């Protein structure tokens, strides 16, 4: 008698979203942050049933929402047997504890969701250390009275959280672990800085791809570097920075780096933890800002990235804009006062357009030069083709020399 094996699909936890549109918090677009919260929740395998929002002058210090709204939420949670309540903001210890006590379900905030996704996406040792550092930094002030609200951060989904044993550590042990991680990351930073300094000494032009999460940075990195990088339609698909040398304009080499994507209300703990990753963009000569032009809130996303770039003291670095996903865009062509191009990573012909944009930006950032090179000096000719943007090579028969014109770094 043959045995049949039945696989049971794990039931998703049911969840509701709760957001407060505070008058004191006008930096972010509230509706788009709630839409993002739904995407973040679904990425964390939560089955979102409903959302509750409230306009207030400011967040309630005790309940996050007003007491009347809390009663409304409680009634819905009990009637529909909801498992998780997700807040659109980072909750204080008191807010989390009070909500947990009143609703008697898991309470998760936006920061925890993003930390969970980062833990899921981290592949390299550096990425995993950075995520753990951010998790512990989030946990440290919440050690007392965390109740059920931190159960997911403690490995509730798989084993990606710091683990229940770490949740039981006292502050001293957590600080010790954080210092250990920082020390390990310092080694990575020093290694990366040596490479970056070497590139700078060799006058290599450096480009960093930046943008909102899921804007298409990895797709363009793949196209320009001729590399099959991870480019699925996922939030925060790229955590570990990738740096490659690419060639444009018949020999001229430049360095291009892919970086972590940004999002509204990106937790400060993550920005701090991923400082070493973001340092790669800080050393760039050009920021190539990829924007999902098909997204209805692409202007908000564009502004969010620029705000974070400013916070990271990178606002002085020249930018060029790739308005991406032209194939999905409807409506007017997006515009900006910065150099820009409107393309689709799905269209191979657009790759040359992006390279041409790069060439124009390289020219504007470099200094013109003219140099005579003896025809016998093949090494010098090769060096100039590799490390400068050559625009003209003219052979002089009278003295058997080449006159080279182009652009180079100071």
Per-region residue spans from a language model:
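N-terminal accessory targeting/assembly segments
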Residues: 1-116
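Switch II of P-loop NTPase G domains
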Residues: 2-6, 31-35, 58-74, 240, ...
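Conserved nucleotide-binding/hydrolysis micro-motifs of P-loop NTPases
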Residues: 21-25, 56-58, 90-93, 112-115, ...
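Conserved C-terminal guanine-recognition region of P-loop GTPase G domains, centered on the G4
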Residues: 34-40, 75, 91-96, 100-101, ...
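Canonical P-loop GTPase G-domain recognition
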Residues: 106-120, 126-128, 134-155, 315-320, ...
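Alpha-helical coiled-coil heptad-repeat register
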Residues: 130-133, 137-140, 144-147, 168, ...
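Conserved G1/Walker A P-loop phosphate-binding module
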Residues: 154-268
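NTP-binding/hydrolysis catalytic cores, primarily Walker-type P-loop NTPases
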Residues: 365-410
């Amino acid at each position: 008698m043959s045995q049949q094996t039945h696989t049971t699909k794990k039931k998703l936890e049911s969840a509701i979203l709760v957001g407060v549109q505070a008058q004191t918090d006008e930096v972010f677009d509230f509706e788009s942050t709630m839409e993002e919260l739904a995407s973040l929740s679904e990425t964390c395998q939560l089955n979102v049933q409903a959302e509750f929002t409230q306009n207030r002058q400011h967040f309630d210090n005790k309940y996050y929402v007003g007491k009347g709204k809390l009663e409304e939420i409680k009634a819905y949670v009990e009637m529909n047997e909801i498992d998780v309540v997700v807040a659109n903001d980072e909750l204080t210890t008191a807010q989390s504890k009070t909500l947990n006590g009143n609703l008697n379900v898991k309470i998760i905030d936006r920061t925890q969701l993003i930390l969970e996704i980062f833990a899921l996406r981290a592949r390299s040792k550096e990425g995993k250390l950075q995520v753990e550092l951010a998790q512990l930094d989030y946990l440290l002030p919440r050690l007392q009275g965390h109740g059920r609200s931190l159960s997911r951060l403690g490995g509730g989904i798989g084993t990606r959280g710091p683990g229940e044993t770490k949740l039981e550590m006292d502050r001293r042990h957590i600080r010790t672990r954080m210092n250990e991680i920082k020390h390990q990351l310092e080694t990575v930073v020093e290694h990366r800085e040596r490479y970056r300094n070497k590139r700078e000494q060799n006058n290599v032009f450096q480009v960093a791809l930046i943008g909102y999460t899921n804007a298409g940075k990895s797709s363009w990195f793949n196209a320009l570097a001729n590399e099959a990088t991870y480019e699925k339609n996922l939030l925060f698909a790229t955590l570990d920075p990738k740096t490659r040398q690419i060639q444009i304009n018949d020999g001229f080499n430049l360095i291009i780096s892919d970086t972590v994507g940004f999002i509204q209300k990106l937790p400060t703990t993550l920005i701090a933890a991923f400082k070493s990753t973001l340092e790669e963009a800080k050393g760039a000569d050009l920021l190539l800002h990829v924007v999902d032009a098909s997204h209805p809130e692409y202007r908000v996303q564009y502004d969010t990235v620029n705000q974070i770039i400013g916070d990271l003291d990178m606002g002085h670095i020249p930018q060029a804009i790739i308005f991406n996903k032209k194939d999905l865009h409807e409506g007017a062509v997006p515009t900006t006062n910065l150099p820009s191009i409107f393309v689709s990573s799905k269209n191979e012909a657009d790759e040359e357009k992006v390279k041409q944009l790069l060439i124009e930006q390289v020219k504007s950032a470099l200094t013109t030069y003219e140099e005579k090179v003896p025809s016998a000096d093949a090494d010098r000719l090769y060096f100039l083709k590799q490390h400068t943007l050559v625009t003209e090579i003219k052979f002089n028969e009278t003295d058997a020399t080449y006159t080279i014109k182009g652009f180079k770094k100071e």
